[in-house]
Every structure is written in structure tokens, then in C-alpha cells.
Amino acid sequence: MFRPRHGTALHSIARLSGQVARDADGRPVGDGDFAAQVEQCYLNVATALAGVGGSFDDVAKLTVYVVDWSPEKMPLLGEGVGRAAAKLGIDPVKPITLLGVAALGEPDLLVEVEATAVIEQP
């Protein structure tokens, strides 16, 4: 089995693949818990950014894919983002596109977060 590549930096632009609710060992996080999955996605975005020499401060845009989106999910989205922000010590407010989708790559996934970042190169 191969290890997934979570992102790449080309010149000073990093485009991260969609981060999902999996821990560092690939185990599911937050089964059925939307806020917990959002939190894990944001934590994974931060980890992937560090892997390409960046940080959450470098994020230029986020795209969030939510299964069966409805406005009633907004408080849970905010809860998950807030918990991740507190753990990471970051300002999570970034330009964002939120898209409702029918399904994601695996049946337990409720949310996926992609990021584009501009990273200063030494």
C-alpha cells in the first residue's frame, strides 16, 4: 500500500488534496459526528501545510465539501472549526467555498477540506 501525498508546493503555491477525518495512522475519527470530523479535517490541513513548509497563516482559500449540506449544520461546522483553532492557536477565518455534495470517497466521511496556500520560499 502506498502512503497518500497530502500536498505539494510549486513555486510558492501549495495545493492540498482534500483532508478528511482520519488520524495520522489512517483510522477514522468522529464516526457520525460532523463537528469532530470538521475538527480533524482542519487539524489535518495544518499538518499537511507543515509538511510542505507552511502554516495555517499561509492559507489563501479553503474549499469545504459537506455531505447533505443544510444550513442547520452551520453551528456544528463552527464548533469543529473553533475546536481545531483552539488546539492549533490559529485564526481559522479564511476565504472559503462551502459545497454540498451527495457523497465523499468513503461512506463514513461527512466532510472534506481542501486548501490553497501561498508559502514564502527562502
Annotate each PLM feature.
Residues M1-P122:
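Short, polar/acidic, helix-capping and beta-turn segments at strand->helix junctions
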